A protein has these predicted regions:
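N-terminal active-site segment of His-dependent metallophosphoesterases
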Residues: 20-98
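Extended active-site neighborhood of metal-dependent phosphoesterases/phosphodiesterases
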Residues: 24-29, 89-216, 230-259, 263, ...
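Active-site neighborhood of phospho(di)ester-bond hydrolases with catalytic His/Asp-centered motifs
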Residues: 47-49, 76-82, 117-124, 217-221, ...
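Solvent-exposed loop/turn segments connecting transmembrane beta-strands
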Residues: 55, 881-889
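A short C-terminal boundary segment appended to hydrolase-like catalytic domains
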Residues: 302, 324-378
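Conserved ATP-binding subdomain of kinase catalytic cores across diverse folds
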Residues: 418-562, 620-630, 635-639, 643-655, ...
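C-terminal catalytic region of ATP-dependent kinase domains
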Residues: 469, 490-496, 608-783, 787-792, ...
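ATP-dependent phospho-/nucleotidyl transfer catalytic cores
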Residues: 521-596, 609-618, 630-633, 697-709, ...
Length: 889
């Protein structure tokens, strides 16, 4: 009896500690259900999720139809995933197919006469029948019923943007794409431009920043915030199943263990939500809409509103805790109204009584500029980047952190005052820039050409957020702190006026460039509400490296510029789309000449040219902030940048480049992706071109663009170092050429390719052909590698059906790795010594011989090309082939 009593008491305590969710409507904020919306609605979104458990029109679907009968054409219905229970859409004639079709018809019939748009998004249950192939079956069925683009994202891809209006953007995410185990879906991403989870985050960050100033709805099946069972809130009944006490223990384990990806406690789910939360802070009007939980919820956390409407055919309990403002475990729907004044409201409707149960405002109306600024300004303004107190440091401090270029941040320089209304015929602000440390504003002229104004004072907190705290929003925590001040001081290792010298030098050697000009930008009416964050300081204003500058000589008169991500996609499309490799090598040598170590992929744009039958891309380097930088100045950073491999790129500018390998830490993966065929004579010719055309006279001319107030002995010191490095450029080039030739990387196209690998003693020749009409056709790559220089050659077939033929006699071969990629590949390995073949285990491939070592695995990372796979360790650069220890690394 005593034992039973103890157990019962323990059970009650556990129940009380864990708390219970329920099915009742719960409120923590004012409920405005009786308030009529007198605002003019711009667009309405009808939200219903998890509606796939109903084979007929009842409950929430009936409620939705009644709402749609009154809806305007400026409306969109979003089915928020789990459109079919329990396991997606089976194949024709498979068990469960009829029931699944009936479930879809019940939903599509509701919108058959709807005058607005309808979008279905996938949930986890929609993935449970063949993964990508099952999704495509559902996509095909829905698009036949409703029309094109009614199932998004398409082709099992992760993200899609829909422009609803000029002020409203819809970003659709397939959250199960991120959460699922890719190794169980060998065909995943084969029809997608995004191939990695990190690339997905890059795309989301780009879209969320581009949508600044607009109401941005992010639709994804799995909620970012929830107070339902997937967030660890359970009903009393769940504590009793399968038995009392055991049910409670089960719930505690589920809440703390994160065993499955359906719950937020799961590591991958939590990683997704934390990163999305952090990136979404860059847009002040983001609204999440989700299903997954079979309830109606409204939560506002971290300034981000979350609408949960996942009770389209089921209901489950919720609990009013934390930042929740409303929850109800009832079958129902939600309506989101975006109003013409920029405000937005949400209303929830329950099938119990078919009535509105909660309504509240999400965002208030757009703020209008209330301050009227003067329109007439003087011609010049003297201003400094930092206040005097920010550059005054003790002797002890400077012994630790160095002198840097700190002094010049506090020097008041005379800059022309600019009125944006008249510059370049008049410029209008478009949106904030997306840099990780620069405070920038994008501007547009009357022709649509874009410009950028960037403050010379960098944003330390923004840098911390982007680099050190990707999964946690910290901007507010670091403002006006010692950490922010210290980082601002570290930034003084780069010379604030260095970018103004680059154009003169680059012009002489045919390297494209932007043309920054120093201005003082006062707060003014042209900035509108951007006056809150911009104005009354020094800026550089330059052409944005983008389309619309076809009259610009420094862009080669190209009217079309693309990003690095888009360049790589283009190069994989066809052998007639090529990179001017020589121009890229010249630009990279110029980076090393001026000491610009910050050359990651987003620091480049690519100008497009049509030359005969070829499309040729040439590099346009941008953001030259780190030219001539002395980041390693001072005792502390001088030591740290030598000890920590990740900081070795921050070498202080001097006549010599002590380690080209580590200086090029950031651009190395891109170099390996783009510099494929060029031999040493190409590099040598570019060195000669640079050293011949950049003379001391040209260097003197370049530095006349420094403000006269900072043109002192330090400028002469930089010029002396630049001349010295110019004299050492051949040595620098030779060292880096050897570094990037240690590994050869050959890539095919996303069409049928034939790779001919001929092996000789100490040498290997790789020739790549297109296959046309079943036979070898045009050669698009040919190079002979020497074993003295190259340790390994990696050959990626990419997509479509590729053939690999390995021939040749001898013993002392370069190791060759063949990575087939998607579709059916053929391997004819006549000499298998030091040949490793990687391909999907569950896909059909043909092996003509049994020679060579086969690594057949469905490991996604092993089989899919990603130029960022190349990794550093403390001694050498190595590739990453998944996590298989047998890869030989």
């Amino acid at each position: 009896m005593k034992i039973k009593l103890t157990i019962c008491i323990a059970f009650v305590i556990l129940i009380n500690l864990s708390g219970c969710a329920n099915f009742k409507p719960q409120f923590k904020t004012k409920n405005d259900t009786e308030l009529m919306n007198e605002k003019k609605v711009s667009h309405s979104f009808y939200l219903i999720g998890d509606a796939g458990n109903s084979a007929n029109e009842s409950g929430a679907l009936d409620l939705l139809r009644k709402q749609l009968d009154k809806a305007s054409k400026n409306s969109t219905v979003i089915f928020l995933g789990d459109n079919i229970y329990p396991k997606g859409l089976p194949k024709k004639n498979d068990k469960g197919r009829v029931d699944a079709i009936n479930q879809l018809k019940a939903q599509t019939n509701v919108v058959s006469n709807f005058s607005g748009e309808t979008i279905f998004i996938p949930g986890n249950h929609d993935w449970y029948n063949g993964g990508i192939t099952g999704l495509k079956r559902q996509e095909e069925f829905i698009e036949k019923k409703i029309g094109k683009n009614s199932f998004l994202p398409e082709n099992g891809c992760p993200i899609e943007k829909v422009d609803i209006s000029k002020d409203i953007v819809l970003i659709i995410i397939d959250s199960e794409w991120y959460l699922t185990n890719w190794d169980k879906h060998p065909g995943i991403n084969s029809d997608c431009e995004i191939k990695t989870r990190e690339s997905f985050f890059d795309e989301y960050e780009s879209l969320i920043k581009k949508a600044r100033g607009k109401t941005t709805i992010v639709a994804l099946h799995h909620p970012i915030f929830t107070n339902g069972s997937h967030g660890g809130q359970y009903s009393f009944k769940s504590h009793l199943e399968p038995l009392p006490i055991i049910g409670t223990i089960k719930n505690i384990l589920r809440r703390t263990g994160g065993v499955t990806t359906v719950d937020q406690q799961n590591k991958r789910y939590n990683d997704l939500r934390k990163r999305i939360i952090t990136l979404s802070q860059e847009n002040e009007k983001t609204i999440f809409v989700s299903g997954h939980e079979h309830s109606l919820q409204y939560i506002v956390e971290d300034n981000l509103p979350q609408i949960v409407s996942g009770s389209g055919s089921k209901s489950s309990a919720t609990r009013m805790v934390g930042t929740g403002l409303f929850s109800y475990g009832s079958v129902g729907i939600a309506r989101l109204d975006i109003n013409e004044d920029g405000s937005s409201d949400v209303a929830f409707y329950s099938s119990v009584g078919n009535k509105k149960v909660f309504q509240t405002e999400i965002f208030s109306a757009n703020k209008k500029a209330t301050v009227n600024y003067p329109s007439n300004f003087s011609k010049f303004q003297r201003s400094a980047i930092y206040a005097e107190k920010e550059i005054k440091k003790s002797n002890f401090y400077t012994s630790i952190w160095g002198e840097r270029y700190r002094t010049y941040y506090g020097v008041k320089v005379e800059a022309p005052i600019v009125n944006l209304d008249t510059l370049f015929g008049g410029l209008l602000p478009v949106r904030k820039g997306g840099g990780h440390q620069s405070k920038s504003l994008r501007l547009k002229d009357s022709r649509g050409s874009e410009y950028v104004m960037r403050a010379l004072r960098k944003n330390a907190v923004q840098y911390l957020q982007a680099v050190a705290f990707k999964n946690q929003y910290v901007k507010d925590e670091f403002r006006d702190t010692y950490t922010e001040g210290l980082l601002l001081d570290v930034f003084t290792g780069s010379h604030p006026y260095a970018p103004f010298t680059i154009g003169t030098l680059a012009d002489k050697i045919g390297v494209f460039h932007t043309n920054p000009v120093l201005y003082y930008v006062p707060k003014q009416n042209a900035l509108g509400y951007y006056n809150d964050d911009f104005g009354d300081e020094l800026y550089m204003i330059e052409e944005r490296a983008s389309d619309g500058h076809g009259n610009q000589k420094s862009f080669g008169y190209s009217d079309e510029l693309i990003s690095t991500t888009d360049l790589l996609k283009e190069l994989h499309k066809d052998e007639d789309i090529i990179l001017d490799e020589t121009a890229y090598i010249r630009a990279r040598l110029f980076d090393m000449l001026i000491g610009d170590w910050d050359r990651h992929e987003d620091q480049w744009r690519w100008a497009k040219f049509k030359e005969q039958s070829k499309t040729v891309y040439r590099p346009v380097p941008r953001d030259r902030d780190q030219a001539f930088s002395i980041m390693a100045d001072g005792a502390l950073l001088g030591v740290v940048t030598k000890i920590l491999p990740s900081l070795r790129l921050m070498q202080s500018y001097g006549e010599e480049l002590k380690s080209p390998k580590w200086f090029n830490l950031e651009p190395y993966p891109l170099d390996m992706a783009l510099i494929n065929e060029s031999v040493k004579t190409v590099w040598d010719k570019q060195v000669q071109l640079i050293t011949t055309n950049i003379s001391e006279k040209i260097i003197d001319e370049a530095f006349t663009f420094f403000p006269k107030e900072v043109s002192d002995e330090s400028v002469e010191e930089i010029k002396r170092k630049l001349i010295g490095r110019l004299q050492n450029l051949q040595t620098i080039s030779d060292q880096y050429f050897l570094e990037i030739n240690k590994y050869g990387v050959v890539k095919g196209t996303n069409k049928d390719d034939f790779f001919e690998i001929k092996r000789h003693q100490n040498k290997t020749t790789v020739t790549a052909y297109r296959i046309k009409k079943g036979v070898k056709s045009d050669v698009f790559f040919k190079k002979t590698y020497s074993k003295l220089a190259t340790k390994e050659i990696w050959i990626y077939g990419l997509d479509d059906d590729d053939c690999f033929e390995v021939t040749g006699q001898g013993t002392d071969f370069i190791k060759v790795r063949l990575v087939g990629g998607q579709n059916k590949d053929t391997y004819n390995v006549q000499n298998g010594k030091k040949v490793v073949v990687y391909d999907f285990k569950t896909k059909e491939n043909e092996f003509v011989t049994k020679r060579g070592l086969r690594k057949l695995t469905d490991n996604y990372e092993t089989n899919v090309y990603d130029y960022k796979k190349l990794k550093y360790n403390s001694n050498l650069l190595i590739p990453s082939f998944g996590s298989n220890p047998d890869d030989g690394f």
